[in-house]
């Protein structure tokens, strides 16, 4: 089991145009219930069950084996032996057992996730509805996305105070490893894969407005959540940004960070970290994402008839900023 934080396997496609009508029809009736691959694999590993117990998950098993565990596809020689060997590590199996005990009733998660996916796919009918899975990886990817699969590694959502996490993750990372992050992370991963970034990665304005677009859409997919949850903040972190809006903005402008292509300075405002560089020590991390969300929210207030497709396709980031009429308080 390696010490590494989650990443997202992204699909570069926005969907296949010829499937548009099919997808629109499916969106009206499809029930996005999470397929518990994690449960079947646990039974396979602990009950000496035959390989056939996983036969219903062949498509995902290939993604899981090749893309997550790097042990090859399910039809490769020795695949199931390698699978058992990977999960033979005692600490990992202890985590797996805890995951199975924690996630017994998925009713609320299924309900919230299904509603969010339905809303998203109604707004982006060209995107293919996914099969939704749950798996355990040993702290690898948080979310895995392919053209037709969406899966989340549940062993990374056992609670910020889960003892094993202290050996593998920093405190600021553990704060986002609770079960209430499952649905936002499913949806965020799916959006990032299907709505990729277009712009200059070195320019802060481009990056924060893209992130702001995703957070704005997430806020509409999960309308009952607290506003700080869309960013991955707690209430105190969000309020700090609110109280220091002018300081955040002035720091960015005075340091010429908003428009100047500079990957290093841009990344400081976006990365998960205990705090954001250039700002006081009590500033939370990823302040750029908070700012992008604020600007896009202001823009959509000014342009309420803008569809989500139009929002995502608009890459004139300076014009978006201008039309948002954003003014820090």
Residue ranges and their predicted role:
Residues 2-13:
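Bacterial N-terminal signal peptides that target proteins for export
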Residues 20-23:
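C-terminal motif of bacterial Sec signal peptides marking the signal peptidase cleavage site
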Residues 25-90:
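N-terminal mature-domain "stem" immediately C-terminal to a signal peptide or N-terminal signal-anchor/transmembrane
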Residues 40-44, 119, 123-126, 220-224, ...:
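Structured segments of extracytoplasmic/periplasmic soluble domains
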Residues 84-238, 313:
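Acidic/His-rich structured neighborhood in mature extracellular/periplasmic domains
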Residues 115, 119, 212, 216, ...:
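Extracytoplasmic/secreted proteins, especially bacterial periplasmic and envelope-associated proteins
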Residues 215-276:
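Acidic/His/Gly-enriched intrinsically disordered linker/tail segments
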Residues 260-329:
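C-terminal soluble interaction/assembly domains
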């Amino acid at each position: 089991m390696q010490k590494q934080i989650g990443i997202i396997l992204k699909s570069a496609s926005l969907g296949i145009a010829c499937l548009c009508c099919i997808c629109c029809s499916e969106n009206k009736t499809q029930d996005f219930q999470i397929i518990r691959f994690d449960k079947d694999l646990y039974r396979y590993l602990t009950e000496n069950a035959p390989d056939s117990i996983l036969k219903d998950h062949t498509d995902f098993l290939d993604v899981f084996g090749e893309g997550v565990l790097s042990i090859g596809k399910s039809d490769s020689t020795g695949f199931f032996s390698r699978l058992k060997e990977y999960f033979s590590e005692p600490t990992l199996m202890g985590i797996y057992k805890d995951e199975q005990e924690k996630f017994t009733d998925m009713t609320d998660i299924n309900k919230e996730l299904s509603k969010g996916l339905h809303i998203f796919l109604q707004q982006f009918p060209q995107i293919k509805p996914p099969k939704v899975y749950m798996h355990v990886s040993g702290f690898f990817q948080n979310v895995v996305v392919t053209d037709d699969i969406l899966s989340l590694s549940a062993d990374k959502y056992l609670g910020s105070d889960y003892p094993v996490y202290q050996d593998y993750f920093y405190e600021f990372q553990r704060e986002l490893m609770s079960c209430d992050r499952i649905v936002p992370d499913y949806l965020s991963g799916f959006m990032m894969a299907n709505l990729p970034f277009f712009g200059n990665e070195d320019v802060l304005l481009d990056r924060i407005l893209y992130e702001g677009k995703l957070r704005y859409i997430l806020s509409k997919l999960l309308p009952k959540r607290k506003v700080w949850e869309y960013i991955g903040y707690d209430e105190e972190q969000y309020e700090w940004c609110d109280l220091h809006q002018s300081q955040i903005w002035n720091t960015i402008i005075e340091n010429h960070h908003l428009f100047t292509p500079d990957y290093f300075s841009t990344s400081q405002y976006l990365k998960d970290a205990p705090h954001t560089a250039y700002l006081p020590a009590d500033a939370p991390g990823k302040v750029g994402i908070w700012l992008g969300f604020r600007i896009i929210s202001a823009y959509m207030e000014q342009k309420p008839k803008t569809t989500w497709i139009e929002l995502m396709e608009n890459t004139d980031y300076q014009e978006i900023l201008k039309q948002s009429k954003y003014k820090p308080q």
